[in-house]
Design a protein with these regions (language model features):
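Conserved ABC transporter NBD signature motif
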Residues: 38-49, 53-54
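Q-loop/switch helix immediately C-terminal to the Walker
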Residues: 69-85
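Catalytic Walker B motif of ABC-type/P-loop ATPase nucleotide-binding domains
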Residues: 133-137, 142
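The feature captures the beta-strand-to-loop junction immediately N-terminal to the Walker
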Residues: 12-17
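Helix-to-loop junction immediately C-terminal to a conserved catalytic motif
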Residues: 30
Length: 217
């Protein structure tokens, strides 16, 4: 795996063919998997599976939705606050408002649409103020209005933290990314700024992605 240094306040898109290792890389970063080699650090501390202190600096949407069935949004929020030992200065109402969900806090998680679940998990992933947020395929289930709202949420959330987003929806991604990371075979092959991509490629991110993919064949 190649070297990669992330900057707070920037949004990184993780792209690559199916099976390239995008989700695996993100799970290694948040301590769910051990990397085969190399070292991962967050705020100059090495990421380890059992290091709860450093892993608390990471927010993710890697939550098994099935495990939340039957629970209300209020219960899930309170459980998250308790786990991260947070003060309730940022309330559930604040969270719902931030991600544009006009729902009752007693609503069951499984009663929401897939898009609503995605937005709720986005808000939940950041209430403990992590320095790094990882979002895997966050556009799944979002209608066009939901995508627009999600993009606005992401922009506001990236002010003081780094975000890594993995998605196959390149057209939506290129509207807000700062950098694109291309991965294949579990290795980071290249990182390029969206500014450069827009200048060099007529069709933007799609052309860049196709070129990098062709080089791997």
């Amino acid at each position: 795996m190649g070297s990669l240094a992330l900057e707070a306040g920037k949004i990184y898109g993780l792209v690559g063919p199916n099976g390239a290792g995008k989700t695996t890389l993100m799970k290694c970063i948040c301590g769910l998997l051990r990397p085969d080699g190399g070292v991962l650090e967050i705020d100059n501390q090495q990421v380890e599976v059992a290091n709860s202190e450093i892993l608390s600096q990471v927010g993710t949407n890697f939550i098994n939705s099935d495990s939340l069935k039957g629970f209300s949004l209020e219960y899930i929020y309170n459980d998250h606050v308790f786990y991260h030992r947070l003060k309730k200065s940022f309330t559930l109402e604040n969270l719902l408002d931030e991600v544009g969900l006009d729902v009752n806090k007693k609503m069951k998680f499984d009663a929401m649409s897939l898009g609503m679940k995605q937005r709720f998990l986005l808000g939940l992933s950041t209430i403990h103020k992590p320095s790094l947020v990882l979002l895997d395929e966050p556009f799944n289930g979002l209608d066009p209005d939901g995508v627009d709202l999600f993009i606005e949420n992401v922009k506001s959330l990236s002010n003081d933290r780094a975000l890594i987003i993995s998605s196959h929806v390149l057209r939506d991604m290129e509207t807000f990314l700062d950098y694109v990371i291309f991965i294949e075979g579990g290795s980071i092959l290249k990182m390029k700024s969206m500014f450069e991509i827009r200048k060099e490629y007529k069709e933007g991110l799609k052309d860049y992605y196709d070129e990098q993919k062709q080089k791997c064949n």
